[in-house]
Amino acid sequence: MAKEQTDRTTLDLFAHERRPGRPKTNPLSRDEQLRINKRNQLKRDKVRGLKRVELKLNAEAVEALNELAESRNMSRSELIEEMLMQQLAALRSQGIV
């Protein structure tokens, strides 16, 4: 039987692995846990009706968005969504969209 990194049910296979540093409480590696966390986040977003959009901006624009979001006491994501919805509403009222 081959030893899988994700298989932590058979502890005898991992009894002699020496790991540096503090003993960890999570049986999964950091990379595996990050993948699980990302998958869970995507599921939570889907339930909330959210879709992922990737956006690349220059540092100046990001800093301006951060400052504005902080002054309005909201997250940058919420601020961007609000700005987009306002712009779309304005375009709809003009009959463009």
Curated annotation (Swiss-Prot):
Q: Which InterPro entries match?
A: CopG, Ribbon_hlx_hlx
Query: Pfam families of this UniProt entry?
Result: RHH_1
Q: Please list the GO biological process terms of this entry.
A: DNA damage response; regulation of DNA-templated transcription
Name the SUPFAM superfamilies on file.
Answer: Ribbon-helix-helix
- What factors induce this protein? Expressed at a low level, probably partially repressed by LexA, induced by DNA damage.
> Which parts of this chain are annotated as the region Disordered?
1-30
Q: Ranges of Basic and acidic residues compositional bias?
A: 1-20
Listed name of the protein: Uncharacterized protein YbfE
Species lineage: Bacteria, Pseudomonadati, Pseudomonadota, Gammaproteobacteria, Enterobacterales
Q: What gene is behind this protein?
A: ybfE
